[in-house]
Structures are given as C-alpha cells and as structure tokens.
Amino acid sequence: MEIGLREWLILIGIIVIAGILFDGWRRMRGGKGKLKFRLDRSYSNLPDEEGSAEVLGPSRVLDTQKEPELDESDLPSLSAPAREREREQKPAKATKRGKRAAEMQPQGDLDLVAEPREPDLFADADDDFAGDNNRNSGFAAAGSAAKELPPVEEVLVISVISRDEGGFKGPALLQNILESGLRFGEMDIFHRHESMAGHGEVLFSMANAVKPGIFDLDDIDHFSTRAVSFFLGLPGPRHPKQAFDVMVAAARKLAHELNGELKDDQRSVLTAQTIEHYRQRIVEFERRALTQKR
C-alpha cells in the first residue's frame, strides 16, 4: 500500500500536535509543583500565633461591632421624629414629660390637645345639642391650650334617630358605641380616638341630640334618648377622610343594631350621595388649607 503526500502530511501534523500537547501538560505540572513549593515556603516563614492574629483579628472585630451599632442606632432613629413632632405640638409641656415611655408620649399630648377642641364643635352644632353650661365649663377647663387651637371652620354631622317611641336605651346604646371604639370623656360625651383603647387624637365625637346634650353614666341604666349625633370638626384629625369613614361606620352600626334612622345635618335622610358630598367637603377643605399654607 503506497502512502501519498497527503497521508504523510496528516501523520506529521498529528505527531506535531501530540508533541505540543505533551509539552504543555509537562510544563503545567511542573508549574504547579513550583507554586506549591513557594506557598509552603511563604507560610512556613510566618509566626504561628501572631501571624494568624494579625490576619483574622480585624475581621472579627468588625463583625462583632456591626450588630451592636445597627441595633443601637435603629432605636433612636425611630423615636426621634415622634419626639420632634411632640415638641412642635406642645412646647410648653416638653419639660414635664420626665421618663414616660415613647409610646405613651404622643397619646398624652394628643389627648390634651384634641379634646378641648370639642367645645368649638359643640358650639357650632345644631340647637338640639344645647349644652351651654357644659360648653362654658369646657372652655374654662381648657384654659390657654384651647386658644392655641385653630377655630373650627366646618362640622360634619350625622344623626341617628330612634324609630322606637322609647328611644335608645342606655345600656344597649353604651354597649353599641363601646364596640365601635368610642369612650366617655371630656364634656360628658363620647369620643373616638385613634386607638380603640381611647388613646391618641380625637377623630370624632358623639353627643346626645336631646337637651342638655350630655350622658350620665351614673344613671345609664335608666337613661334613654330619641337621638344621638356624631360630629367631626375641620380642622381636626390629621387624616379627616379616614376619620369620617370610621364615623360613618359607627353611625351605621348603631342604626342597624338599635333600629335607628340616619339623618344628615339638615335632618334629611342620609343617602350615599350625601355621604359622598361630605367627602367632597373634606377634599375641598384640605385643598383650601394647602393653598393657604403656600
């Protein structure tokens, strides 16, 4: 069998490629041995204890310091905005807070600031809310704090009138409004605060729609009334639209469970359209407030 030039060239190429691969493998193996030898020599020259302390020491110190720094810095960063807001609302009371817990500070301040606002709401309400003597005493108790509050410009009123001739009975009425989060307070009427427990700013209030407009808890078992009125003043809560929704829910619950009828501030039947009109009044008030600030 004769071998042509083409076959010889292919055979020579294969031999050359095999030689190149073998040479590369030999060099690579020799290089690994030298590198390992150099690393062994470099580590053998380092001190056993001091060298390891210098290499590992800094990383351990940094790791142990990170967690305490983050934990300690997070706590003041969360409470600082609340403290600054309290100082702006009640600068005269800043030095009397002492060692109150961070959660209790806004609740106490909001109670003192928001509750005196109710006399203004009551004074602007319907004649059915007549309680002149109680309003005057409320103003006297408020003192200088009431003077710092902005005047109430608008009052949103929802009345619940009993369909029964006997009216709303005291025990049933009390149980119903307590379930809605209202608590007995300033001016002998009920207030709904931010917290269901009765802490935080006042969102809205509920008064007796029959003179003298108050509730007597000592005689609540024998108490009855033909109507009650929920009212929300503007300016008032920080989030008036949400507060209004809570007020509507409380009024609807009372009307549904105690056989009452919802009325608006004109003593007309409260409809979905009327509720939407109330919401629009809130939006317009907020828009005017922003315009005045600018």
Swiss-Prot record:
Q: Which membrane topology describes this protein? A: Single-pass type I membrane protein
What SUPFAM superfamilies does the entry give? Cell-division protein ZipA, C-terminal domain (SSF64383)
Keyword annotations = Cell cycle, Cell division, Cell inner membrane, Cell membrane, Membrane, Transmembrane, Transmembrane helix
Composition bias of kind Basic and acidic residues appears in 82-91
Q: Where in the cell is it found?
A: Cell inner membrane
Q: Which domain of life is it from?
A: Bacteria
Q: What is this protein called?
A: Cell division protein ZipA
- Species this protein is from: Pseudomonas putida (strain W619)
Q: Which gene encodes it?
A: zipA
